Amino acid sequence: GSKGALLMRSKFTGIPGNASGTMHQDDFIANVQYRLKRRIDVSEVPSVRTRVFLPPVAEWEKRSGPHFGFRLALETTALIEKEIGFLKLKRKEMGNEIYWPGMFIEFESKADSRSRTDDYAYLRVRSNQRGADFRGPQITTTGWWTMGISVTPDGMVHYYASPGVEDLTEEDYITSQFPYGYEAERMRTFFYNICSADEGRRWSTSFIVDDPKVFLVRPKGKQM
């Protein structure tokens, strides 16, 4: 059984107390690098797994778009824009780039469309090599799901998901990508997104997360 599940929902996902009427997200960050006092090299083959409870569809926010996200914060060396000198002139040079691949629970609400007769949900993957999100598996059941993301020494990101709370296997594999064309070098942390319409009246969909774990195949130094 659970020893510390966390229910997450939000109403003002932009500026607290100031509704914008535009979809925003709140982030719940695990801050793995602060607990370990270091970042995780991809040679250690990190992976993160979490359980997430999806409520009955009738309890979801009546809004099409992303409702929940499970993502990593990764680092690579890439061409980035920097401000140089007193005049803060901008130029591009090689530097440390942080990016955030992951999976979103996407909802297509029949309340938003006259032609849509049913609600529909699926996983949206971030991202392909060009930086574009793409559609993953359809979500055909609510309740508990298990989601996982791993990074291999070649810098590739691998995505897994399955209904239920069983450990993930090869059968739960979705895709492998170099998001944005980047080859990951280090992992900083993982985090969750809670999204809402940010209109100050409706709460976001309530999701429960439980049992998040970070695994290293070849850990360096001190054991986790």
Task: Set out the residue ranges of the language-model regions.
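Low-complexity, Ser/Thr/Pro/Gly-rich disordered linker/stalk regions
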Residues: 1-129, 135-137, 155, 171-224
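Localized edge beta-strand/strand-to-loop motifs within extracellular or lumenal beta-rich domains
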Residues: 140-164
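Beta-rich nucleic-acid/ligand-interaction surfaces
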Residues: 165-171
